[in-house]
Amino acid sequence: MTKALQDLTVLEISDDKGMYAGKLLADMGATVILIEPPTGHAARRTGPFAGNIPDINTSLLFWYNSTNKKSITVDIETDTGATIVRELAKSADILLESMPPDYLDSLGLGYSQLSQINPQIIVTSITPFGQTGPYRNYEASNLVLMAMSGIMNSCGYDDLPGSPPICCDGLQGYATGCNLAVISTLTALHHRDTSSMQGQWVDCSIYEALSGTTEAAMPNWYFGKQTPFRQTGRHHGTVATPSTQYESSDGKLINGFDIPPRTVARWDALIAWMDETGMAGELNDDSYRQMIRNRSREKDKVNTIVKLVRTFIHSMPAEEAYHRAQQIRLAWAIIRSPEETLEDPHFTDDRGFFPSIYHPETDKSYVYPGAPYTFHKTPWSVDRRAPLLGEDTLEILHTLLDFNKEDLVLLRESGVI
């Protein structure tokens, strides 16, 4: 079947900040040519490594972020290497890059130069702070961007005096920037193909992408001069809310978002459930139901609800609490470790979220996370594991640029590829 982006050719010159964007395009069918230095993409040297054996071809970070891509090694800082990229750009739809501002321009590979030889090319630049402004050349990591954007200030604990903000793991800042970079790139592509037939430069700031996800923090300050504060395991806010984490009988935690429930119907269902074991107690008093009906929050009543629900959840295993709550439309969930999702049939069997990808060099298949979307007519799939370093160099330079064997030998001997 046809893939959604299978007619697109994308050149990628990235580091760890931009490689996820290339993966998203490749997994939807685009031909993504990863242009690596002869020493390899920086992520290839980042662990953990398969089998705990550090190697240029065993980084799990690189594996995940480079599925379906092709790899060519080119030293773009040489005149010949830069010329090779320009030749590839003549027939490319997109150049995706996450190098520092002005770096590609200094090599003759920026948008202003490439658009002269290919007016239809879209160049998407993913940088920490964008191409303009006083921060444009500032160094940043995922942690720096999460801190600068305000995200970290909303994450942490309210029950540990003086505790600092914390940052979630997993390069979430880079992932957010890359997701929005792909959306903006496809928007530019749509404009090109439906209106102007002209490409454009897309300037993506990870800092701005993250700042736009702080939800009500900015409006609260702008309109009310209120600063949201951190709350353990739940949403930050300007008003303290009850704890949402409750221990079950088997020691696992339930995240009970709907406590107290927001509707009378859900309240009635919760009380009926608790009454099955005689644990609703004074919650049967109509004054609690009236509070829910009026959408008010009387502190003493809320505290009583939380206390009794906590005892109720502690009387049963987490799986029972989770599934029974969902049956009556309460937004409760088990707080899982990431690996526990691998055992959930909803994801493994029904959704097929974890594909197995074959690696011929090890003659083994490995389980990967899939995509959070499915296409009924243009399927998403991982057809190839991440490329070995330079695995496709000879094929691409021969088939796309008509280099012969003698040319390729000379390029390799001179260190260009």
Where are the regions a protein language model picked out?
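Flexible, small-/acidic-enriched active-site or ligand-binding loops
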Residues: I166, T362-V409
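Conserved small-residue-rich beta-alpha loop and adjacent elements
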Residues: T2-G40, G47
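Aromatic-enriched alpha-helical interface/lid elements that frame and gate functional surfaces
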Residues: P242-S243, E247-I328, W332
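Active-site-adjacent "lid/gating" segments in soluble enzymes
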Residues: Y20-M28, S91, Y103-P260, A265, ...
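Glycine-rich phosphate-binding loop and adjoining beta1-alpha1-beta2 segment
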Residues: A30-S71
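A structured beta-alpha segment of the ubiquitous adenosine-cofactor-binding alpha/beta core
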Residues: L11-S14, P54-Q116, H314
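A glycine-rich dinucleotide-binding beta-alpha-beta segment and adjacent secondary-structure elements
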Residues: Q327-W380
